[in-house]
Amino acid sequence: MNTSRSQAIFGAAQGLMPGGVSSPVRAFKSVGGQPIVFDRVKGPYAWDVDGNKYIDYIGSWGPAICGHAHPEVISALQEAIEKGTSFGAPCALENTLAEMVIDAVPSVEMVRFVNSGTEACMAVLRLMRAFTGRDKVIKFEGCYHGHADMFLVKAGSGVATLGLPDSPGVPRSTTANTLTAPYNDLEAVKALFAENPDAISGVILEPIVGNAGFIQPEPGFLEGLRELTKENGALLVFDEVMTGFRISYGGAQAHFGVTPDLTTMGKVIGGGLPVGAYGGRADIMQMVSPAGPMYQAGTLSGNPLAMTAGIKTLELLKQPGTYEKLAATTERLISGIKTAAGEAGFPITGGSVSAMFGFFLCEGPVRNFEEAKATDSERFGRLHRAMLERGVYLAPSAYEAGFTSLAHSDADIEATINAFRESFAVIG
């Protein structure tokens, strides 16, 4: 496979941007080799600058649930862009998308739009503290909530991929108020509440972990967190930047039947454009300026292009049978991956929920980040390179979930499973 142009472009990029990328995981540090430079995307496919075509299971890290460059989304954006790219003023499209989010997500009575998932989590952290008058927060090992200082403690995503314990430049005084517990461990959370009476503002988590690989909540875990937070006067926050509108139209909270106090969102609700949002109970959201004293603002928040793409994407997702199709596609894929690994004699554990999946190259089950570390990262790197050579683009990290879309066909899934079978046979 010729990737000479990708190599040249990435080589030049390293003198222009730190590590040659705008986000660390894209640099292929944990899988080896040089990253592929994309030229265009359409449906379930991506083409690099050398003309190689790939079946894509990253989907821009989650937003492309309808497939890349969906014609109805593109058409809506073409019409909207003629009216301007950013207003910096109230826009009727904000009302439309806000109503759609409020109608869909059980916890959301009011919503504030921002520009990224990180920004949403930063704001919701401040809101938790403002509403409760408490400074401490509980997060879970391996869960990633963006790159804000207080969250870079035993975090997932690129932090996990690069094996970093945290990040230089984060003051100890900032992280002193961040308490951590193993995912799926209610007893550890109980102990933290007991050790910090009347000091914890809330608990924030990915209801399905997607930034330490793919880890599902065990039965009773989310329900237990809901009870513990209520008992201790703390807030429960679901980071649904990844799971929102992907696991179901109402997100993971609708899927599992557990309603948090606050929710952060992003990715899908922007239809591929930069976006984030946080929302929840009206009495809490009324704390946000200008309605209340907790300040948060953004120049490009609620911009008409992101709102337009989000509205059209949610309209497409609301059509009958959408999530049944996504679930069937993803279940077939992960089943085929596990079968192919078994045929090659490799240990594997994994699963899927709706349009989100993942696997670890180790014996299961994997219930938390510590157990996820048992995955064979070196073998995954070889697998990743072998899959690229066979035209399949997976996340360049053993610690990232994968995503399917409405555009992935049965033929795409079959071709992908065959590529896994061939790759497992050659990687050793």
Curated annotation (Swiss-Prot):
One of its GO terms (cellular component) is cytoplasm. It is an enzyme of class 5 (isomerase). One of its GO terms (molecular function) is transaminase activity. Its cofactor is pyridoxal 5'-phosphate. Gene3D superfamilies: Aspartate Aminotransferase, domain 1 (3.90.1150.10), Type I PLP-dependent aspartate aminotransferase-like (Major domain) (3.40.640.10). GO terms for biological process: chlorophyll biosynthetic process; protoporphyrinogen IX biosynthetic process. Keywords: Chlorophyll biosynthesis, Cytoplasm, Isomerase, Porphyrin biosynthesis, Pyridoxal phosphate. The modification N6-(pyridoxal phosphate)lysine is found at residue 267. Its EC number is 5.4.3.8. Pathway: Porphyrin-containing compound metabolism; protoporphyrin-IX biosynthesis; 5-aminolevulinate from L-glutamyl-tRNA(Glu): step 2/2; Porphyrin-containing compound metabolism; chlorophyll biosynthesis. It catalyses: (S)-4-amino-5-oxopentanoate = 5-aminolevulinate. Its main location: cytoplasm. PROSITE patterns: AA_TRANSFER_CLASS_3. Belongs to the class-III pyridoxal-phosphate-dependent aminotransferase family. HemL subfamily. NCBIfam families: hemL, PRK00062.1. Homodimer. This is Glutamate-1-semialdehyde 2,1-aminomutase.
